[in-house]
């Protein structure tokens, strides 16, 4: 289990992540939703050890994330951001295998893993020799996912992974990602501001606003048992994405 225990973080005079406690069961998919600037990405960065909490602790099982073990714990997680974050001067293969080669994993093991990941994300192995600029947006995000999965982490952190894609590519990758998550059985924590996208992926949603958790529950919980008027307001503003999701089911 992954836990945030009474964690807070002030990023600027205008934004503070209020003390919050969250736990994420192994093998589940949870989506953090809410408007831009509400603290969703800050939660991911805290989990990844990219920022240090002002108070509280981040725990992986019984281990507390701290400076001394942050690098080791990061090897257990994969991180995908909106634009992919690929190194433009490296080939696709070098981007994906970067961490494995830094850790001096055997080359036959790396080759085998590259083949497995190409099959998993439906990317042609021929693209491994290309550079990110030669790929479409959807292909770059598939490569970013491959890189995140290279070391077979138990945790995937996805920060708006589909946000920069056109609608057609986004829809296709959305379906593929859900299949991949189900196949891998990993703990997935994803950030989006799109309610339809959140409902597509998650068993459980966490709605945030102004650095606070407004409600945590299933889509049905949020629709039928809103804990705050803002829950209904947020969902109503995104009624069209939810209706599209329902019509596609």
Language-model features, listed with the residues they occupy:
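Conserved catalytic motifs of ABC-family nucleotide-binding domains
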Residues: 152
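Conserved ABC ATPase "signature" C-loop
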Residues: 210-211
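Helix-to-loop junction immediately C-terminal to a conserved catalytic motif
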Residues: 48
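ABC ATPase "signature
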Residues: 216-217, 225
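Conserved ABC ATPase signature
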Residues: 131-135, 139
């Amino acid at each position: 289990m992954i836990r945030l225990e009474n964690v807070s973080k002030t990023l600027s005079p205008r934004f503070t992540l209020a003390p919050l406690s969250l736990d994420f069961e192994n093998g589940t998919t949870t989506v953090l939703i809410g408007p831009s600037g509400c603290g969703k990405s800050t939660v991911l960065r805290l989990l990844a050890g990219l920022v240090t909490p002002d108070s509280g602790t981040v725990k992986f099982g019984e281990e507390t994330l701290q400076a001394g073990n942050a690098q080791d714990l990061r090897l257990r997680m994969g991180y995908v951001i909106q634009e992919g974050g690929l190194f433009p001067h490296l080939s696709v293969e070098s981007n994906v295998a970067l961490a494995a080669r830094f850790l001096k994993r055997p080359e036959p093991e790396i080759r085998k893993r590259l083949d497995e990941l190409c099959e998993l994300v439906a990317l042609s192995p021929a693209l491994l020799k290309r550079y990110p600029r030669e790929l479409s947006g959807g292909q770059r995000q598939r490569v970013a996912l491959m890189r995140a999965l290279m070391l077979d982490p138990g945790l995937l952190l996805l920060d708006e992974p589909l946000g920069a894609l056109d609608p057609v590519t986004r829809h296709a990758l959305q379906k593929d990602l859900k299949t991949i998550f189900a196949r891998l059985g990993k703990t997935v924590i994803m950030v989006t501001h799109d309610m339809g996208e959140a409902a597509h992926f998650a068993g459980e949603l966490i709605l945030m606003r102004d650095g606070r958790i407004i409600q945590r529950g299933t889509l049905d919980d949020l629709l039928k048992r809103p804990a705050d008027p803002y829950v209904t307001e947020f969902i109503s503003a995104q009624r069209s994405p939810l209706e599209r999701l329902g019509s596609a089911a």
